[in-house]
Amino acid sequence: MQDVNRLKLVLVEQKKTSKWLSEKLGVSQSTVSKWCTNSSQPDIETLARISKLLGVGMEELFNKKFMESV
């Protein structure tokens, strides 16, 4: 599977954990873990919430190569 998002990297850059994000979003840690490993992807509304929580633009959450392919 292609790496679609950079969520794991952005969390590290922001010094945040997947546990922190799961608590803020009200989802399980396993869900956030799947997003971080690109085994599944959050929906667009959740991506918008994530970008707001992390203070980054939504485009920063996507892998550049993926964005170039769409």
Walk through the language-model features, giving the residues of each.
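DNA major-groove recognition helix of helix-turn-helix/homeodomain DNA-binding modules
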Residues: 45-60
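Recognition helix of helix-turn-helix/homeodomain-like DNA-binding domains
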Residues: 27-42
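A short, Lys/Arg-rich alpha-helix, primarily the initiator
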Residues: 1-17
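Short, charged recognition helix plus adjacent turn
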Residues: 9, 15, 34, 60-70
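The alpha-helix within a helix-turn-helix
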Residues: 11, 22, 51
